[in-house]
């Protein structure tokens, strides 16, 4: 694994590129979170241990592995690595994308002209709701990990 030789570069690649790729899939494919278990396993069992200079024994995840994965999913401002769990975030990402594109989708289905202002308003509202939902989820996880 490249992360063994260049952990910083592997982290940067994950946080700047790969996350955007799997988030795109999550936004456009309903139920994508169910299909991202293998990706989550690779992040938890291979990437995170290498970044933390730990080594996995290849067995099932230990309680420590699960805890470490939970911590690394936290935003950097809360001392995590900001590597979200694709299995847990995909459904929320899809719902936000569907809500943000609702006005334009409906106009296309009805064969009507697209109201750009309505599309922008719908998108802004969906993004604001998404941001609030993510904030609440992060705060809940922060409290759970702190107790």
Task: Please provide the spans of the model-predicted regions.
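Nucleic-acid-interacting cores, centered on viral/eukaryotic replication and modification enzymes
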Residues: 1-147
């Amino acid at each position: 694994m490249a992360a063994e030789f260049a952990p910083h570069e592997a982290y940067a690649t994950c946080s700047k590129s790969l996350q955007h790729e799997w988030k795109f899939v999550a936004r456009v494919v309903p139920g994508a979170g169910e299909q991202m278990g293998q990706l989550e396993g690779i992040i938890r069992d291979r990437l995170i241990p290498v970044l933390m200079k730990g080594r996995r024994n290849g067995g099932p995840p230990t309680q420590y592995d699960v805890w470490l994965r939970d911590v690394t999913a936290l935003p950097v401002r809360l001392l995590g690595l900001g590597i979200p769990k694709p299995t847990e975030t995909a459904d929320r990402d899809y719902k936000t994308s569907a809500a943000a594109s609702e006005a334009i989708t409906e106009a296309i289905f009805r064969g009507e002209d697209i109201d750009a202002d309505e599309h922008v308003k719908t998108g802004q509202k969906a993004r604001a709701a998404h941001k609030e939902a993510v904030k609440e989820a992060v705060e809940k996880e922060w409290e759970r990990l702190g107790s």
